[in-house]
């Protein structure tokens, strides 16, 4: 996934106060190719230790090698090296492995069809839509999944503006349902009277 190197940079920046945090990168891509790409990448901060593992993204035994139960958080990106990659299958196996553990899982969906279903069934899942996500939002979600969208939208000075309006289509919906209704804007609050 093209976002992975930016995510590594963001993780390194977010963990400057840690002594060499470890990131495990698991992909269907061969391990030697992942190492080559890492060596050629422009990761700004070498203060993180990156371990690469290759395997089947849908196989529980192979995912168990990652020791996800001890992770601070997990990011599941769309794996472009796998033909017909199915993030839903990977998330189901991940959920099985993490059954009783409260590890935040940030998942990058290509479409929003299953975002609502997965969000309602797993409180530790933070889904992001591939068409509207930046690597920094994905990484910032590790730190605080409730406000990361808001903070980064404010910090991004690319001409975005804030509008206040009474959107009738959002009346009576939860915050999560509102976010799914309006994919081209960032909702950062709902006013109730």
Q: Residue locations for each model-derived region?
A:
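Cytosolic regulatory regions of ion transport systems
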Residues: 1-193
